[in-house]
C-alpha cells in the first residue's frame, strides 16, 4: 500500500488521539442544554421502577432511546473499540453506528468492521457509515452497498462533513451533486438512509431536501459536542491550515436549536439528536424538544477503549438519569416526556 493510500488511516489515528487526549481535546461551543429547564413535578404519582423508556429505530425496539454515535472506523485500535461498543449495545438494548467504513472497505484490513459485529449484536439497530463526499466517486453506490453488506446493517448513515473536509488539507472540496447521489443511494441501497451531520447541525431547509431525496432518518449532530474543525486545527502541520480551521471551532447550529427547527419542519420524520449530549438529563431535554433518539460518541469513547463493562456502566448511568428526569416531570413514558412542561427562559435557543 502506498503512502497516499495510508493517509486516511493515519488521519483516523490522529482524530482518535486528539479526541482522547484531555490536553488537546478541542474546546467547543456550548450546545445550550443548560438553558432548557423542566418544571419540576413534586408529586409525580409514578413508580420510578416502572418508567417505560422503550423506543424504536429502523423497525427494532430498544430498551432506551439511545444511539452509540459514529466514532472510529478506520484505525487498528478500532477493532477492540467496536467490539466493546457492540457487545455493550446488545447488553443494553440500544442502537449503534460504526464510524466511517471507507478505510476498511478500501484496504485489505477490515479492522473489525465485519459481520462479526452483527453476531455480537444480533438484536439491536446497527448502522453502517460512509461519507457523503464518497458517494460522488465512481464506485460510490457500490461502496454504500458494500458498507451495509459488510455488517448486515439495518441502515446506512451518510455523514455530511462539509466543514471538516473544507478545512482538512487533504479534504474533499467538490460537493457538487452530493444530494443527487444521496437520492440515488436511497433508491439503490436495500436499507433506509440516515443523514447525519458531524457537529455543525442541520437546518430545516437541508433536512427537508434530504427527506425529499429519500432519506428516512435525520441525525442533526449539532454544535456543542466535538468540533471537527478544531480537531483538524489540532492536527494541522501548517500554521495557515491551523488558523483557517480554528476560526470555525465554534461554527454551527447548536443541537437544541437544530432539533427544534427540524421537528417543526418535519413533524413525522424519525429524528436523532446528537452533539453535546452529556448525560441522561440532556437526553430528556432532547426528547422534549422533538427528538426520538439521542446519540453520544465522544462522551463514551474513553470507556470504549477500556472494556465492554465500562461502556455498559457508562450507559446504565445515562439510562438511570433519564428515568429520574421522567419521574421528576411526572412522565410515565417518552410520549409523556414530550409533553412535559418547561420553565420559561429568555435564553432558550431559537430554532
From Swiss-Prot:
Its cofactor is FMN; NADPH; Mg(2+). It catalyses: isopentenyl diphosphate = dimethylallyl diphosphate. FMN binds at residues 69-72, 100, 129, 196, 226, 276-278, 297-298. Substrate binds at residues 11-12, 100-102, 164. InterPro entries: Aldolase_TIM, FMN-dep_DH, IPdP_isomerase. Keywords: Cytoplasm, Flavoprotein, FMN, Isomerase, Isoprene biosynthesis, Magnesium, Metal-binding, NADP. Its EC number is 5.3.3.2. GO terms for biological process: isoprenoid biosynthetic process. It is found in: Cytoplasm. Its main location: cytoplasm. It is an enzyme of class 5 (isomerase). PANTHER family: ISOPENTENYL-DIPHOSPHATE DELTA-ISOMERASE. Homooctamer. Dimer of tetramers. This is Isopentenyl-diphosphate delta-isomerase.
Amino acid at each position: 500500500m502506498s503512502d497516499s493510500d495510508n493517509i486516511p488511516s493515519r488521519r483516523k489515528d490522529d482524530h482518535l488521539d486528539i479526541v482522547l487526549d484531555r490536553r488537546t481535546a478541542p474546546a467547543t461551543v456550548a450546545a445550550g442544554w443548560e438553558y432548557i429547564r423542566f418544571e419540576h413535578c413534586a408529586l409525580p404519582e409514578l413508580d420510578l421502577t416502572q418508567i417505560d423508556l422503550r423506543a424504536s429505530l429502523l423497525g427494532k425496539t430498544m430498551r432506551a432511546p439511545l444511539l452509540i454515535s459514529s466514532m472510529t472506523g478506520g484505525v487498528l485500535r478500532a477493532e477492540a473499540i467496536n467490539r466493546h461498543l457492540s457487545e455493550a449495545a446488545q447488553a443494553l438494548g440500544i442502537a449503534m453506528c460504526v464510524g466511517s467504513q471507507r478505510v476498511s472497505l478500501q484496504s485489505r484490513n477490515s479492522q473489525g468492521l465485519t459481520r462479526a459485529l452483527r453476531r455480537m449484536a444480533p438484536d439491536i439497530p446497527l448502522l453502517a457509515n460512509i461519507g457523503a463526499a464518497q458517494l460522488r466517486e465512481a464506485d460510490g453506490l457500490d461502496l454504500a452497498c458494500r458498507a451495509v453488506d459488510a455488517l448486515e446493517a439495518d441502515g446506512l448513515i451518510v455523514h455530511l462533513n462539509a466543514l471538516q473536509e473544507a478545512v482538512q488539507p487533504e479534504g474533499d472540496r467538490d460537493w457538487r451533486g452530493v444530494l443527487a447521489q444521496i437520492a440515488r443511494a436511497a433508491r439503490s441501497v436495500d436499507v433506509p438512509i440516515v443523514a447525519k451531520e458531524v457537529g455543525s447541525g442541520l437546518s430545516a431547509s437541508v433536512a427537508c431536501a434530504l427527506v425529499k431525496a429519500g432519506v428516512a432518518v435525520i441525525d442533526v449532530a449539532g454544535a456543542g459536542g466535538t468540533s471537527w474543525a478544531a480537531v483538524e486545527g489540532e492536527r494541522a502541520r501548517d500554521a495557515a491550515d491551523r488558523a483557517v480551521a480554528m476560526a470555525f471551532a465554534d461554527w454551527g447550529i447548536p443541537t437544541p436549536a437544530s432539533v427544534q427547527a427540524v421537528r417543526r419542519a418535519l413533524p413525522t420524520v424519525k429524528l436523532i439528536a446528537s452533539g453535546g449530549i452529556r448525560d441522561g438529563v440532556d437526553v430528556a431535554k432532547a426528547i422534549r424538544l422533538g427528538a426520538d433518539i439521542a446519540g453520544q460518541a465522544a462522551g463514551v469513547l474513553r470507556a470504549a477503549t477500556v472494556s465492554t463493562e465500562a461502556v455498559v456502566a457508562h450507559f446504565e448511568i445515562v439510562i438511570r438519569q433519564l428515568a429520574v428526569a421522567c419521574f421528576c416531570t411526572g412522565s410515565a413514558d417518552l410520549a409523556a416526556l414530550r409533553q412535559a412542561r418547561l420553565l420559561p427562559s429568555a435564553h432558550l435557543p431559537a430554532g
